Amino acid sequence: MTVFYFIRHGKTEWNKASRYQGAHGDSPLLPESYQEIKLLAKHLAAIKFVHAYASPLPRALTTARTLISELPSNIPLTVDSRLREFNLGKMEGRRFDEVKARWPQVVDSFHFHADKFDNRLIDSESFSAVIDRFRAAIEEYAAAYPGSQNVLVVSHGAALNAGINGLLNVPLARLKDRGGLSNTSTTILQTADGKNFQLKKWNETDYLHKTTVDPTDTI
């Protein structure tokens, strides 16, 4: 089995401000995010990773590099644009409440009814486009590392949610059934053939030892 550990990047200033970042927006990690990445590294310390892959967007790449620096072994890192965040078009850079007021149906479908999402209304990517590029990347990694090997993938909330559910062949109408993915969370999939994937863990965050749930942590 090739086992994939999917990590969502650490929380950023725009995450905290409830502002969409997407594929073109970005903001620095919060100071506390670096401590959370250290907790993640401690959680993963016993696992031997053969390779790490990361989105080129600074918030994800910084998370990946910080995480690797905290792990006991030297893990090679490859930057792959196929792991970038969902291109959200006109939503990018805007606050959640502003976007909801301007495009209520778009926001509802994006968060809850992916099968009804019309990307043309905001000049964004479609769910199918994100799923296709994500699948192509992960299948390539699985082919490169068959057998009992562990692969680390650092990406973004919306892209990971769509891409992972795509790997699990979840229909668009059910894409949001498991809920969102939190900052610095771990989701684990395994595959024996590089084509069919099984879910082992979804949105694991216990190692962060959070006592309260901040709604801006999860998308």
Model-derived segments and spans:
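Short, conserved phosphate/pyrophosphate- and ester-handling motifs at nucleotide-, phospho-/glycolipid
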Residues: 9, 156
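GST superfamily/GST-like fold recognition
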Residues: 157-161, 198
